[in-house]
Amino acid sequence: MAAPGPALCLFDVDGTLTAPRQKITKEMDDFLQKLRQKIKIGVVGGSDFEKVQEQLGNDVVEKYDYVFPENGLVAYKDGKLLCRQNIQSHLGEALIQDLINYCLSYIAKIKLPKKRGTFIEFRNGMLNVSPIGRSCSQEERIEFYELDKKENIRQKFVADLRKEFAGKGLTFSIGGQISFDVFPDGWDKRYCLRHVENDGYKTIYFFGDKTMPGGNDHEIFTDPRTMGYSVTAPEDTRRICELLFS
């Protein structure tokens, strides 16, 4: 049963509202719009705004009270852009280039069944690094994800980067199926909470699938300002919401 008083539901996107990198189903979309009649809803994802639109619809800022791409470094409230932060002014060009060069050099040494293109994607608030390359097909994505579960390719890459860039104020966070994010310390999904913590909510619920240590939902999931729920799929998210808000 939900706690009394004004509340907000914040949802991760991949694995929580949609299958990884897939569009939201009509059933889930309809369910969330019904839920919105009872409670404010928002989304927070690591992906950029265009990818959030691809998955949740071009009208995403009209369908959710809050939309936080890139962990909230880009923020929309009530359909309007609130703010946009950028990584280069915070970290400086020298560190960004060192990081990009090191990642490309590391990727060049990994042998995988397949490699495609877009190994590093530069976003407003982070770098997204993918050993297989973001332009892989859905089948290639699943193949890499299964291999990564056995061989911990991303985990080893991140461990190496943490050692190489220790003391540089960087966080490395694994999310989704094929990549991990690199951003300044404190720019994880908790960043979005600064946009909502003064809006009068008694409870902020968070739903995410990568809630384990090292996962990109972990920090916001364990933050004392949220009530965190770990989910395994969109169906699981819906089930928990129905229990809480029926």
UniProtKB/Swiss-Prot annotation:
Binding site for Mg(2+) 2: F221, D223, T226
Single GO BP term: protein glycosylation
Source domain of life: Eukaryota
SUPFAM superfamilies linked to this entry: HAD-like
Biochemical pathway: Nucleotide-sugar biosynthesis; GDP-alpha-D-mannose biosynthesis; alpha-D-mannose 1-phosphate from D-fructose 6-phosphate: step 2/2
Catalytic activity from the UniProt record: alpha-D-mannose 1-phosphate = D-mannose 6-phosphate
GO cellular component, one term: nucleoplasm
Binding residues for alpha-D-mannose 1-phosphate: R21, R123, R134, R141, S179, D181
Keywords from the UniProt entry: Acetylation, Congenital disorder of glycosylation, Cytoplasm, Disease variant, Isomerase, Magnesium, Metal-binding
Keyword set includes Protease: no
Annotated consequence of substituting I132F: In CDG1A; slightly reduced activity
Modified residues (N-acetylalanine): A2
Residues binding Mg(2+) 1: D12, D14, D209
Result when mutating D188G: In CDG1A; severe
Subcellular location: Cytoplasm
Gene Ontology terms for molecular function: metal ion binding; phosphomannomutase activity
Cytoplasm among keywords: yes
Chief place where the protein resides: cytoplasm
Root EC class: isomerase
Stated consequence of mutating R141C: In CDG1A; loss of activity
EC number: 5.4.2.8
N6-acetyllysine PTM sites in chain numbering: K149
Active-site feature positions: D12, D14
Disease: Congenital disorder of glycosylation 1A: A form of congenital disorder of glycosylation, a multisystem disorder caused by a defect in glycoprotein biosynthesis and characterized by under-glycosylated serum glycoproteins. Congenital disorders of glycosylation result in a wide variety of clinical features, such as defects in the nervous system development, psychomotor retardation, dysmorphic features, hypotonia, coagulation disorders, and immunodeficiency.
Family from the record: Belongs to the eukaryotic PMM family.
Protein name: Phosphomannomutase 2
